[in-house]
Structure formats: structure tokens, C-alpha cells
């Protein structure tokens, strides 16, 4: 899988940009704030419909963009993608929302097209599979559990259309169940038939949660094997990384979706009193976590910055291999400032891993001195200046 043509309009600091891309390694270099990271962000957004950097899509639209015929300004990302199952053209427009006086409102409107036909945003996910690494991804290792759950969800949503839809349904039911629990707590009065009132929500949440758990547990086993050996190669050490899934409910030995759903339903019933007192659902996929161990040591808690960054890199490259094994196509690998904070040995091992056949990789750097002559000869280069790409 690779992007052979990318077009941007009024996205971040890009006014207009059309570029043909090769299916190999592409190096984007130039000064800070030139637009290197924004180009990776555009590709990630097209693949996942979300920005890795912003909570509000309206800020994706270039600040001085002008709309047409009085319409609000918009950003446009379009790509022609080659895949094993056949080519596809993907397009997404992000349009600012304005009030009657022309002043910007919160949020933005998304318009999606697949092969020039209107589509839902959720249908875009998985059409183009990407793996993104940024300097802040060390938070996958030492940050809050929500970062690790989000990582698993983005990975699996790209691989499995049913996962992304089940996740959306789970989140909807969770919100409704929590609203009910919170309302009862605030009223300080419970209905006579609490179990009957919650029975439907318990059943629906458990069924959706069981599927999410089954897919997560399966993926963690595969990722642990893939990222484990990659960690050893990058670090040059003797020990492999081991990834452990920490469930917030007692799952016992359950691993299939049906058995996991039953374990969740039992957990909800067992925690009924505590949930009513606190006004929230206390266990389930929305409260789970991952732990990263090397030689029995939790490096999320006790690892050095270099070790944690190496884990994050190994996790991302392992994710790319998982996508290739499961989907038959290697995803597009997006590496932003990947060499910072790595010593020379780790850099050498990492660059050897990046230069792989049938793998389109886009990586950014501020200069070329960090790369070997062999790497520079093998990679296609673009100099990035003020939102423009120049070959060479």
C-alpha cells in the first residue's frame, strides 16, 4: 500500500501542494515550522479522520484561507492510493463553521469522498492504513492509560471495520449508562428495580466490550512478539520487550468475545453498589491499560528516556508489521523527527529497519547530517520550505 499522489489545499501552512510520491523511503528535510510535520499530519488525518495534534479540526484550515462565493474557508486533503485489493481515491474537506455575522464558531464540518462519491467519515477508516510516530509518542510508555487505549483503538480500527463500529457503539452505551448512574447518585434515590433498569445497558455494554477485549488481547499477543524482537534489534541488547494487557475486570481465562462478555456482565453486577455510589462504570475496556516489561522491569515506570523512546519506536514498527501480516499490505509509515534523542547505535539499527522493500516510509529531519550516504542514496528527498516541497 502506498500513496502515489497527494494534494493539499489550505491545510495548515500549505496553500497549494501537489506531489507525486514513490513507494519507497521519502525524506522530508528543512527547518522547524516549515511544514514537514503538517504533511505527515495530513496523511494521518486522511487515514483516521482525526488529527494527532489538535482537538479542534477548524485549526487545520490555513489561518488566512478564503472561502469561495461567500462560503466558509476549508482545507482539502486528497490522495490516490495503490493497494493490493485495487486503487482508491480518498478525499476529505474540513470546513470552518461561521455564524450569521461571519465569525468563526467552534468545530468544523467534514465532507468525505471515496472514489469521488460522498461517504461517511467512519467509512474512510481502513481505506488507507498508516502508522505514525511523533516525539510525543513516548507518552505511550510513560503517559496515562488513555494514551495506550487510544493507540490500540486506532490500530485495530484501521484493520477491522467491525471494531471501529463496535467501539463507537460501546462509547455511546457507556455514556448513557454513566448518565443513568450519575443521575441516580445526584438524586440520592434509587428506583425499586435497579437491576432491571441497568440490565439492558449491562447486556449491551458487555456484548460490545467483549468483542473489543477479544480483539485487543489478540493484538497484544501479536504486538508483543513483533515489537519484542524489534526492541532488541534497535537497542542492541539481549532482552526482548514484553507487552502485558492489564484488564480492569477479572477476565479469568476467557479469551473469546462471548466468554469475555459474560465476564464483563458478572463484573458489572458485582460492582453494582460501588458504581451507584460513584456514578460511573468502574471496569471495562475504557479503563484497561498496557505495561511494557524488559527483563521483568516495568520500563514505563522505571525506564530511562532512551529506553522508553525505543519502546515507542519498536511498538510502532511492530504495528506496521502487524498490519502487513493481517491485511496483506504494508501500511504507510510516518516517522516525525524519529532520530532525536537516539544514540548513534540506535540510529543505525533503526535506519536499517526503515529501509525495507514494499514499505512506503515518510520521515522528517531538520538536516541531512544524521543520515549515512547509503541511506541518502536510497531515499527520495524533498526539501520543505514555508509550506512548499522541492525535490532534491
UniProtKB/Swiss-Prot annotation:
Superkingdom of this protein's organism: Bacteria
Major subcellular site: cytoplasm
Keyword Cytoplasm attached: yes
Pfam families: SMC_N
Keywords per UniProt: ATP-binding, Cytoplasm, DNA damage, DNA repair, DNA replication, DNA-binding, Nucleotide-binding, SOS response
MF (Gene Ontology): ATP binding; ATP hydrolysis activity; single-stranded DNA binding
GO cellular component, one term: cytoplasm
The UniProt record lists the keyword Cytoplasm: yes
UniProt binding sites for ATP: 30-37
Compartment(s) of residence: Cytoplasm
Gene Ontology process terms (BP): DNA replication; DNA synthesis involved in DNA repair; double-strand break repair; SOS response
UniProt record similarity statement: Belongs to the RecF family.
Chain's role: The RecF protein is involved in DNA metabolism; it is required for DNA replication and normal SOS inducibility. RecF binds preferentially to single-stranded, linear DNA. It also seems to bind ATP.
Protein name: DNA replication and repair protein RecF
Organism of provenance: Chloroflexus aggregans (strain MD-66 / DSM 9485)
